[in-house]
């Protein structure tokens, strides 16, 4: 009898837990767990996803993880990526669609040492510049093309050093400049002992070379599924709630990031500082893509006369369907 009762209890518990289990959503991040993705971790920690009936799995990225490949292979429902790489992938046959744009501004920069002769963009000619690849190189290549600087190492151009994920090429003198983000690597350079007066910083946002970063992308075919669209509406709504909470509570958001840093490599000082910088980039966005920002990004990517990132105006690369339903 006791065995029968136990079996009934187990069956009832299973039925109840199944009935109340949220719809599963997996998001693939562009990089490792850090404040760059605070909105998603905050939304999960504060129960915003639960309130929308979602069971969200957050997959950190890394140097050997290509979010678009994970998405294409069915390993995620939605991914965080920069628009240049997403549009380049779309032109090459992977139909990615932007469904939301939490980041309004670009944090990408080129940070240079003044003692290596770089004070203005005119000084870049003949210099070695550290550049990130894996899709991150597209804004840089477009910018160099607009400046009339070849990237093949010729005398009238620049030499591109394939940069890893550190800033050692700059600090050790291998490159005059390296790629940095306003919220991350720039501060690593500063922590290495360099003062603002010793550095020349070119912000893509002010150089007219900025492109949209950290948008949410899905596969186009999935948007034909009503249940998938419904999940994305709820996901975007909860995620933007997480982002606005993180903006208003940077220290708490940083603490949540540290709690989810399974690798244990992040520090409180760095994450609090990063969250403060990230908030400057998400400010002004409610999650809905601004068509003028999209048009600017496309213009930048197509502006390379000899080697444009994309060769034609994209069609169907973004939609307001999700954000209109989620935010209005």
Which residues fall in each region the model found?
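Positively charged n-region of N-terminal signal peptides that target proteins for export
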Residues: 1-4
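Boundary at the C-terminal end of the N-terminal hydrophobic targeting segment
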Residues: 19-21
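Conserved C-terminal helix/tail region of periplasmic/extracytoplasmic solute-binding proteins
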Residues: 294-328
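Short, glycine-/small- and polar/acidic-enriched structural segments
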Residues: 23-163, 169-172, 176-183, 202-204, ...
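Periplasmic-binding protein-like
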Residues: 102-112, 195-224, 236, 276-278, ...
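Bacterial N-terminal signal peptides
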Residues: 6-16
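Secondary-structure end/capping motifs
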Residues: 224-305
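Sec-exported extracytoplasmic/periplasmic mature domains
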Residues: 45, 72, 91, 145-149, ...
